[in-house]
From Swiss-Prot:
Protein family: Belongs to the MurB family.
Gene field: murB
Name of this chain's protein: UDP-N-acetylenolpyruvoylglucosamine reductase
Upper lineage: Bacteria, Pseudomonadati, Pseudomonadota, Alphaproteobacteria, Magnetococcales
Ranges of residues in domain FAD-binding PCMH-type: 28-197
Function statement: Cell wall formation.
PROSITE patterns: FAD_PCMH
Chief location of this protein within or outside the cell: cytoplasm
This protein's UniProt keywords: Cell cycle, Cell division, Cell shape, Cell wall biogenesis/degradation, Cytoplasm, FAD, Flavoprotein, NADP, Oxidoreductase, Peptidoglycan synthesis
GO cellular component: cytosol
Amino acid sequence: MKGSHGPCSDLTVTMLENVPLAPLTTLKIGGNARWLVRPSGVKGLSRYCRTCPGDLPRFILGGGSNLLVDDNGFHGVVVDLTHTLNAIVVEHQDAHGGILRVEAGAATRKTAHVARQNGLAGLAFMAGIPGTIGGALRMNAGAYGCDVKGVLLDAQLMDATGNLHTRNAQELGLAYRHCDLPKGWIFVSARFHLARGESEAIKSQMRDYNHKRTQAQPLRYPSAGSVFRNPAGAAAWQLIDAAGLRGHRIGDAQISEKHSNFFVNLGAASSLHMEELIELARNRVAQHSGVQLTLEIGILTPQGLRTEPGR
Ligand SMILES: Cc1cc2nc3c(=O)[nH]c(=O)nc-3n(C[C@H](O)[C@H](O)[C@H](O)COP(=O)(O)OP(=O)(O)OC[C@H]3O[C@@H](n4cnc5c(N)ncnc54)[C@H](O)[C@@H]3O)c2cc1C
């Protein structure tokens, strides 16, 4: 119900109660959010940060493509920027290139296509990465030797009290699937510094990347992408494979036959089964190769987001 009740009554946010989270994630697993807010814009987000009770846990949701939600849902406030903070604008361009300004709730794939349409190169790697620019910043998303760090000019962030700050890639400490985001801060937008490119050439590069993806990844099934981080000098999928777990299944949660670091939902997987599968893979890999795998994905529990070192 809009702005009329809940922990943060305000006309600048839409506030919904008991919202199913599974449809808002790519894995399609999990229970309800106690509250879900959609701020009307940057001002609405700032007002929400200033007025919402600090004792309620808060989670910023992007495209939910790096996330496993607990079957019992989340007993706090999910902030969703995808409906209102999703503009993609060419801020400047000349013969050498340009600057693309993108709000955090914009889809990563759409961002890549807008850059291409404007003859701006450097975001082709994003064409097959699901989710939003906010999530891509938080995860320093990357593929095919490129990542957000390599193209980010700067990002605008909001702190827990609703004030705006600007940070560049170095200040954000972007590294492999990592960002030094201060606790409670939210990405609002990003500016990407892109070189001039030829739209058809960028399109063909995207096609090539997406073809490789289709060959290697189980895109027909719901998943959250790579479950584990690649340990130094190794690929998590090879370690899981070597431990004999390719295709292993608990209920409807399965280690993909196609890519052993993608765990797929065959239809009605529960978070319980997915977590059992994760722990099985972790233990078997430790026994088989002596490597301790850590999660790339986050697990949203009723109390908040659970992550592992490095993320
Ligand atoms: C089929 C498939 C393929 C994938 N391929 C790749 C790949 O090639 N490379 C890669 O890097 N990843 C890949 N991923 C993983 C995932 O798509 C990326 O990590 C993506 O960038 C996550 O974005 P999201 O918006 O979905 O984030 P979410 O899953 O919604 O959130 C991820 C984290 O970001 C935080 N977050 C989201 N928005 C904000 C914000 N505005 N401010 C602050 N924090 C925020 C969340 O709180 C959470 O901690 C893949 C996933 C799938 C399902």
